[in-house]
Design a protein with these regions (language model features):
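Active-site environment of divalent metal-dependent phosphoester hydrolases
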Residues: 2-7, 27-30, 48-50, 66-67, ...
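A short acidic, amphipathic alpha-helical/loop segment
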Residues: 8-15, 130-134, 153-161
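Glycine-rich loops and low-complexity Gly/Arg-rich segments
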Residues: 20-23, 45-48, 65-69, 81-86, ...
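Core dinuclear metal-dependent hydrolase active-site scaffold
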Residues: 44-134, 212-220
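Loop/turn elements at helix/coil->beta-strand transitions in domains of secreted/extracellular proteins
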Residues: 16-17, 115-117, 138-140, 163-165, ...
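Binuclear metal-ion centers of metallo-dependent hydrolases, dominated by the metallo-beta-lactamase
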Residues: 19, 33-51, 156-220
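Active-site metal-binding motif and surrounding structural segment of the metallo-beta-lactamase
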Residues: 1-34, 40-43, 135-143
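Active-site neighborhood of phospho(di)ester-bond hydrolases with catalytic His/Asp-centered motifs
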Residues: 1-2, 20-24, 119-125, 141-147, ...
């Protein structure tokens, strides 16, 4: 529920209504921060499966990236900035507990469509643990946090271990911080996968562009 992920949720709810799916421990603060009616909030708990009209959602525990530890930047309860950092820059009314809650409560999840297409979402530092949860799921598509410290070899390891057909990066906008060329990065990842005879591939999507993902039959 950090501001860079949740800042539009109030606007979207007021435009489309519906239910807001959110980690249960963060539900009250999300409702308060964005003035969303309590009845529209749908608290989620790890280990549960939720059935909707168009898809099934399986929720797993998650853990935020530990970049703050690597860079020596900590959010302590004693620091008054913890109620502002990560929120005020995105137009969220402060003080707010969205920043601290977003660091503590994280989910990974798997979506299965009515056509049995499986999409896995995993972010943060607990990829190895998440693999244990979904080892029998074999998702078609995985959305994986591209943590800036990952080498192409490490990123290739993840798609190979997951067994997915395609991997798309999450939070890859962080490459702007270092001026990194993600197209070149993904090219290296795919070259590594090819060298390992792994059929999985990754792709760097262009921001704000729609794509179709499909299974095709091509004549030789």
């Amino acid at each position: 529920v950090h501001g860079d992920h949740s800042n539009l949720v109030g606007e979207l709810w007021n435009r489309f209504y519906g239910r807001v799916l959110v980690p249960a421990e963060c539900a009250m603060e999300v409702a308060k921060a964005y003035d969303i009616p309590y009845g529209a909030i749908y608290p989620l708990y790890p280990g549960n499966t939720y059935y909707f009209d168009d898809f099934t959602l399986k929720v797993y525990p998650g853990a935020h990236d530990n970049r703050a530890f690597r860079e020596g930047k900590f959010q302590r309860p004693s620091d008054p900035r913890s109620l502002y950092d990560g929120s005020e820059g995105f137009g969220i009314s402060c003080p707010s507990n969205l920043g601290p809650l977003g660091s503590m409560y994280n989910f990974n999840y798997l979506i299965e469509t009515k056509n049995n297409y499986r999409i896995d979402f995993s972010a943060g530092r607990d990829f190895e643990e998440h693999l244990q949860h979904v080892q029998k799921e074999r998702p078609n598509l995985m959305l994986r946090h591209r943590i800036r410290s990952y080498t192409p070899e490490q990123y290739a390891d993840m798609i190979e271990q997951m067994g997915a057909q395609l991997m798309l990066p999450l939070h890859h906008n962080n490459a702007r911080a270092s001026g990194e060329d993600l197209n070149e990065y993904m090219r290296k990842v795919n070259e590594i996968l090819i060298s390992r005879n792994c059929s999985g591939r990754t792709f760097n999507p262009e921001p704000y562009r729609w794509y179709q993902i499909c299974t095709s039959i091509l004549a030789e």
